[in-house]
Amino acid sequence: MAKRLVEELERDGIVKSERVKRALLTVPREEFVLPEYRMMAYEDRPLPLFAGATISAPHMVAMMCELIEPRPGMKILEVGTGSGYHAAVCAEAIEKKGRIYTIEIVKELAVFAAQNLERLGYWGVVEVYHGDGKKGLEKHAPFDAIIVTAAADVIPPALIRQLKDGGVMVIPVEERLGQVLYKVVKRGDKIEKKAITYVMFVPLR
């Protein structure tokens, strides 16, 4: 089932690199959804978790992962851990060589994600934190890449500050006509923003 889904994403031009393709084929999405949704794990759509959160659709996970151009040795911050699936895909995309710090505001979700990641062997590559993702994780900054999996009103200044020079942030931003996914690149004091597509995420709390 995973193979068919990934082939479709490849055909649609969403999966572009071997790294992301391999990561999606390696991470068992059914292990990151609630038991009642296991049969739907390889449908290309978001699925409910709890506390109003969702696990992102596979095409969105693939797209965001491709946009940061994953490579071994990267230090990545994820804001909005959810069930831990996206962090696991990123871990595989960097070949588990590097570190992913992920922060979740809902304590029950942070615990759920940590249990999933530990059970599946991602402990030591992925670190889960409970806290306010808008503030980032100053103690581990700067980051090569930041992925935000909830829609912000504005790009949080703390996240821009914690991005390495030349680093990439992928973030959905709430705008007048809807949410827009941006690829943000930091160049010294300048920020380059590129609109990618319209999206629909839960709000960044």
Curated annotation (Swiss-Prot):
GO terms for MF: protein-L-isoaspartate (D-aspartate) O-methyltransferase activity
GO (cellular component) term, any one: cytoplasm
Entries under InterPro entries matching the protein: PCMT (IPR000682), SAM-dependent_MTases_sf (IPR029063)
Reactions that this protein is recorded to catalyse: [protein]-L-isoaspartate + S-adenosyl-L-methionine = [protein]-L-isoaspartate alpha-methyl ester + S-adenosyl-L-homocysteine
Gene Ontology BP terms: methylation; protein modification process; protein repair
Subcellular location: Cytoplasm
TM segment ranges: none
Keywords, alphabetical: Cytoplasm, Methyltransferase, S-adenosyl-L-methionine, Transferase
SUPFAM superfamilies: S-adenosyl-L-methionine-dependent methyltransferases (SSF53335)
PROSITE patterns in UniProt: PCMT
The protein's Enzyme Commission number: 2.1.1.77
Superkingdom: Archaea
Active-site residue numbers: 56
The protein's role, per its UniProt record: Catalyzes the methyl esterification of L-isoaspartyl residues in peptides and proteins that result from spontaneous decomposition of normal L-aspartyl and L-asparaginyl residues. It plays a role in the repair and/or degradation of damaged proteins.
Family assignment from sequence similarity: Belongs to the methyltransferase superfamily. L-isoaspartyl/D-aspartyl protein methyltransferase family.
NCBIfam families found in the cross-reference section: pimt, PRK00312.1
Protein known as: Protein-L-isoaspartate O-methyltransferase
